[in-house]
């Protein structure tokens, strides 16, 4: 097996990268069989964006504050951990946004796409699902659409539903909804087409973010699940990601 190791700025992560490089050698990202990010979920997310075109599996090693999608490095041989690992396919969301000046932006998100107010005024957003209006006006700080992989990130902080990793469901979640106040969001099929329209965008300007890429002064957003830029992420078979997701739903 050939590995490409990369780490966050965490001193422990850097030290682990050094030790693993001494044990297994360091290969270029193009020559490696596996890409091994050492850090937190943020580093894994960054790696997926940077290297998705290479069609290499990712095996994250946890040295982050949360590391929900990462694996704990045990005394077991790394080769054995990867050989026995469970595979999961991460399909990104493809976001197409239009600015108030009619500029068009595209970006991909493995976690979520969020549309947020960028002034002191609440956003007013019309929501369409599969080209049918489902909400004429959501008054809120914002709204987000999350993948199953991203459902334990920003979506969870916004009180959205946690989704099983293989569920093929998207979570649509309001952020600090004012009207309708009791609306908690919706669970949508992965094949759904979602459209947001910012109402009164001349005075209630909004920005849209796809993972870590932001565009400002947005008037419309279209989101679909995409087969482009899919990634394979590996999980330690002895520490099930499914159990992590289940347990997270009972943490208070």
PLM features: residue spans?
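ATP/nucleoside-binding phosphotransfer catalytic cores, i.e., glycine-rich phosphate-binding loops
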Residues: 107, 115, 120, 133-135, ...
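ATP/NTP phosphate-donor binding region
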Residues: 1-34, 38, 44-53, 73-89, ...
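Catalytic core of DAGKc-family lipid kinases
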Residues: 66-142
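Short glycine-rich anion-binding loops that position phosphate/pyrophosphate groups of nucleotides
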Residues: 40-43, 64-66, 149-152
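Short glycine-/acidic-enriched loop or helix-start segments at secondary-structure transitions
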Residues: 15, 46-48, 69-71, 155-157, ...
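Gly/Ser/Thr-rich active-site loops/lids in small-molecule metabolic enzymes
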Residues: 144-181
């Amino acid at each position: 097996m050939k590995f490409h190791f990369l780490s966050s700025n965490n001193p422990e992560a850097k030290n682990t990268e050094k030790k693993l490089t001494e044990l297994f050698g360091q290969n270029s990202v193009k020559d490696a069989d596996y890409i091994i990010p050492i850090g937190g979920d943020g580093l894994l997310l960054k790696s997926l964006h940077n290297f998705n075109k290479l069609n290499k599996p990712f095996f994250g090693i946890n040295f982050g504050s949360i590391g929900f999608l990462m694996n704990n490095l045990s005394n077991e041989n790394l080769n054995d951990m990867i050989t026995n690992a469970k595979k999961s396919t991460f399909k990104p969301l493809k976001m197409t946004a239009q600015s108030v000046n009619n500029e068009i932006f595209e970006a991909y998100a493995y976690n979520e796409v969020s549309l947020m107010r960028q002034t002191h005024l609440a956003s007013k957003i019309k929501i369409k699902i599969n080209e049918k209006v489902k909400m004429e006006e959501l008054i809120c700080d914002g709204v987000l659409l999350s993948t199953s992989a991203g459902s334990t990130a920003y979506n969870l902080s916004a009180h959205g539903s946690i989704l099983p990793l293989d569920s093929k469901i998207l979570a649509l979640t309001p952020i600090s909804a004012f009207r309708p106040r009791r609306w908690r969001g919706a669970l949508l099929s992965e094949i759904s087409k979602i459209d947001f329209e910012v109402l009164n965008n001349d005075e209630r300007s909004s920005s849209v973010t796809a993972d870590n890429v932001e565009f400002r002064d947005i008037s419309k957003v279209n989101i679909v699940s995409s087969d482009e830029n899919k990634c394979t992420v590996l999980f330690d078979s002895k520490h099930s990601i499914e159990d992590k997701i289940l347990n997270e739903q009972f943490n208070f």
